[in-house]
Amino acid sequence: VDEGALDEATGLYLSPLHCGGCDQVCPGGFGPHAAPSCAPSGKSAVCGMACDKGWVDVNNAGWDGCECKFLSEDDHPDGVDRNCDGVDGNAAKAIFVATTGSDAWPGTPTKPVKTVARGLQLATQINRRDVYVEGGSYLGDIQLAAGVQVYGGFSKGFAKRNAKTWETVILGV
């Protein structure tokens, strides 16, 4: 007996209690603000995780559920990831700098540049409002640019910002 579990549009069973067939229950055990889900995948159905409205799974780790409450489209570094992009601030509006970076890289969170000067140069060239700098010591002079903010004190990977925990020092030459 179908009992309403069959999705007419796809011809698949898409209920978390009947995912792909009768009594094929999607496992739970997710963290807060998350629940089991069932979705079409090609010609079959697969179990997954669905976030509660207003919550986002930033790190794709079900064990901690949907860990980020979406608060705003825009975000400035203030200790809270308000737009749930995985960065305290707005990743789409920033250039990233890390001691492990390379000035030949594009300045993204996974390919940061090495110097603050290069970060400022890129921000000006491609119209980014912020430069986010991981904690550490950076050599070289910098020239601030109009309309570009520089924020230090970021953790490795840029997920968190605390200027006391991840001190950032720029040593001019």
Regions found by a protein language model. Name each.
Residues 102, 130, 171-173:
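Glycine-centered low-complexity coil/loop motifs and glycine-rich tracts
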Residues 139-142, 158-160:
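Short active-site-adjacent helix-start/loop capping segments
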Residues 90, 124-125, 143-145, 162-164:
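Extracellular/periplasmic catalytic domains that process cell-envelope and extracellular macromolecules
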Residues 95-99, 114-139, 148-155:
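Glycine-rich repeat segments that build the extracellular carbohydrate-interaction surface of secreted
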Residues 1-101, 107-114, 118:
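Membrane-associated feature with strongest affinity for ZDHHC
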Residues 148-173:
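Right-handed parallel beta-helix/beta-spiral solenoid domain characteristic of secreted/periplasmic
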